[in-house]
Amino acid sequence: YLVKSSHGLGAFFGVFSVLAVLPFALSYWEDRRNHYLCFVETRAGKTTYCWSHLCVTFLGAFLCIFLGMTAAYSLLLLKMPMLRASDAESLLYEIEMGDGKRNFLILSRTFPQMYFIASIAADAARYAFLAVTVFAASEKIKNLFVLASLPILLEYVSQILADSLGLPRWMRWYTFNGTSIDTLSDFLEISGYFLILSFLIGVVFWLLIRRRELDG
């Protein structure tokens, strides 16, 4: 239940956005507010500053979500089973019926652990992408409240645009999360998907910095 309820818009999304995403995503906003940019960019260079901060933002948010959720679920294991008997029976039934879609995770001897690790890692990559997006947006958006609300606004607006324009699934980034994990390839595809999106956002951020430099 906790794994499923942690996806989409809700209390989990708000908590993760505030506690994990924003501390890393607002580093550029903080540097600009305190006039650190001139000093840092002079010593390290704009390109180095840009990409080093983007990498720290992505990896920091990823590890924060991954390790935090892993610790939380590990504590729950002390009182609750990772996989209920009814769930185990359903999985065995799928295997007997020849459902090969879940062959990697179900047939693994450590299926519960593998499933939770893959699911949590996929969600962590998603939140890392949101952190990078807020980080890049802080180049243009100065209002802290708007930046803090950006993850929720981004998901709402993305859903509205995708439904209105009939966009294909690969453009609906908000649908990719831990519940989409069935095989190892699913996990690799989702993680790679958000990694590529984060890189593209990073390129946009770098171009914005270059443009600001040219404009003086």
Whereabouts are the PLM-identified features?
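Extended hydrophobic/aromatic segments used for targeting, binding, or gating
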Residues: 158-184
